[in-house]
């Protein structure tokens, strides 16, 4: 019985983020299912949108859903503008951003930062936990690609972390329950 309680507690801590909203129909769908977060991709990608489109979608979005801006090596001013305009609640840095970059960003914004880690080893994840960010996002490493590969990684590499994290990479309706345990 105690083990079931622990599992229930862990699952209740699980939050859902759907990334890559690009069309009004996508916003209608997430409004129906009410994930905790949605991601607007501002980085070069097939799912890329602009700031004005994000603001338009934000107005359509159920107020219970928080928005995440997905950026790769973006100018600090671009991120500051998206935050100031109210387009995004959280900033997801998915590139090669350094500690210094994140420190400078925190001088400009108060929004929480999610730092993506393209997982190669357990040591790398433990080192990333020291970064000046609110959350980590653990994603699959694919050479030359910053994310969105659709492939998973070995979840046994994930150590016990104190910092909350998002799990990405190859998640599907068929495997999501297995991956959040």
Question: Positions of the model-derived regions?
Answer:
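Conserved N-terminal beta1-alpha1 strand-loop-helix module at the mouth
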Residues: 5-181
């Amino acid at each position: 019985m105690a083990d079931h309680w622990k599992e229930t507690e862990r699952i209740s801590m699980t939050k859902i983020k759907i990334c890559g909203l690009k069309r009004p129909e996508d916003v209608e769908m997430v409004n129906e299912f009410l994930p905790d977060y949605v991601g607007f991709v501002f980085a070069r990608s097939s799912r890329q949108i602009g700031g004005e489109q994000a603001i338009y979608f934000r107005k359509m979005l159920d107020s219970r859903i928080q928005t995440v801006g997905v950026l790769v090596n973006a100018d600090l001013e671009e991120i500051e503008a998206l935050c100031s305009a109210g387009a995004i609640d959280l900033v997801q840095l998915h590139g090669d951003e350094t500690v210094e970059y994140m420190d400078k960003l925190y001088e400009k914004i108060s929004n929480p930062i999610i730092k993506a880690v393209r997982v190669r080893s357990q040591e790398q994840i433990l080192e990333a936990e020291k970064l000046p960010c609110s959350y980590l996002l653990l994603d699959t490493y694919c050479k030359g690609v910053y994310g969105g590969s659709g492939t998973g990684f070995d979840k046994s590499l994930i150590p016990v972390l104190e910092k909350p994290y998002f799990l990405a990479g190859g998640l599907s309706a068929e495997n999501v329950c297995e991956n959040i345990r």
